[in-house]
Swiss-Prot record:
One of its GO terms (molecular function) is small GTPase binding. Facilitates protein transport into the nucleus. Could be part of a multicomponent system of cytosolic factors that assemble at the pore complex during nuclear import. InterPro entries: NTF2, NTF2-like_dom_sf, NTF2_dom, Nuclear_transport_factor_2_euk. The gene is ntf2. This is Nuclear transport factor 2.
Length: 123
């Protein structure tokens, strides 16, 4: 079995660097069966997911990861990843806290996001 913690770290670094620089480039990480739950809105499919991410009402964003936990799922090499962290949006000085969960599915050694759940954490 591959080192799932290293996989989770590499994936999240790539995902957030891409998200922060050009969200439209995230399409290669999703498939038609992929699902995104974003602040209660549920979307399915690459096109719908990327359209949602691109339409978010900010120009600049910076993700700062606070915690990252991963576990293997099943026998196919898939991995579930839970991330908590902070977002800095546009010119805001106060970071917003968030939680995000990814279910990464192994497809012949290449991984894609089957499930993506995102929530801002208030309070």
């Amino acid at each position: 079995m591959a080192d799932y913690n290293a996989l989770a770290t590499q994936f999240t670094q790539f995902y957030y660097q891409t998200f922060d620089s050009d969200r439209s480039q995230l399409s290669s990480l999703y498939r038609e069966e992929s699902m995104l739950s974003f602040e209660g809105a549920q979307l399915q499919g690459t096109k719908a997911i990327v359209e949602k991410l691109v339409s978010l009402p900010f120009q600049r964003v910076q993700h700062r990861i606070s915690t990252l936990d991963a576990q293997p799922t099943g026998t196919t090499g898939s991995v579930i990843v839970m991330v908590t962290g902070e977002l800095l949006l546009d010119e805001e000085q106060m970071a917003q806290r968030y939680s995000q969960v990814f279910h990464l599915v192994n497809n012949n050694g290449n991984y894609y996001v089957l499930n993506d759940l995102f929530r801002l954490n208030y309070g």
